[in-house]
């Protein structure tokens, strides 16, 4: 598996994973493509045998980064790809002198919360009813570096 910066060749696959994982809340292919020209954005993909297995997207403003999306397609889950993507993102962010990475996660998504805790994230807040379908709170997690 290789982790690299997303390019135009990856956009359709990333959009398909978005739809698979997030349904009607998914980013469109046009929105994903727009991130290629967003100077604040950094998106990485995990590629296995020519197939995009997963991705992570972020946006950095004033040395603080928000993780926008992370997802792994069903065929590649439970193989540590999400962990590798977030770890690679943190390393890339350190190189551009970002000081922190913040994300939101569903309060019910305990597997993701366990991964983020393992990677050194701590809970810093809660956004009531942040998610729709179903309505649910988001936990705000942050990692300083």
PLM-predicted stretches and their roles:
Residues 78-92, 114-118:
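Conserved acetyl-CoA-binding loop-helix of GNAT-fold acetyltransferases
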Residues 2-75, 86-88, 92, 96, ...:
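Acetyl-CoA-dependent GNAT
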Residues 67, 101-105:
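Conserved hydrophobic beta-strand within the GNAT/NAT acetyltransferase core sheet
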Residues 104, 117, 122-138:
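Conserved catalytic-core motifs of GNAT/GCN5-like acyltransferases
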Residues 137-145:
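Terminal substrate-recognition subdomain of acyl/acetyltransferases
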Residues 7, 73, 77, 104-108, ...:
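Residue-level recognition of the GNAT/N-acetyltransferase active site
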Residues 86, 109-112, 129-134:
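Short glycine/proline-centered loop/turn elements that form peptide/ligand docking sites
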């Amino acid at each position: 598996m290789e982790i690299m910066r997303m390019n135009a060749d990856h956009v359709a696959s990333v959009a398909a994973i978005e739809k698979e994982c997030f349904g009607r809340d998914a980013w469109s292919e046009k929105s994903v493509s727009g991130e290629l020209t967003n100077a604040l954005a950094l998106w990485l993909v995990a590629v296995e045998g020519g197939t995009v297995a997963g991705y992570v997207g972020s946006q950095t403003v004033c040395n603080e980064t928000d993780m926008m999306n992370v997802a792994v397609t069903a065929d590649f889950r439970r193989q540590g790809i999400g962990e590798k993507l977030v770890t690679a993102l943190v390393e890339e962010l350190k190189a551009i002198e970002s000081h922190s990475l913040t994300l939101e996660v569903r309060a019910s998504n305990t597997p993701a919360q366990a991964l983020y805790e393992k990677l050194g994230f701590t809970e810093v807040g809660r956004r009531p009813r942040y998610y729709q379908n179903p309505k649910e709170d988001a936990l705000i997690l942050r990692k300083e570096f």
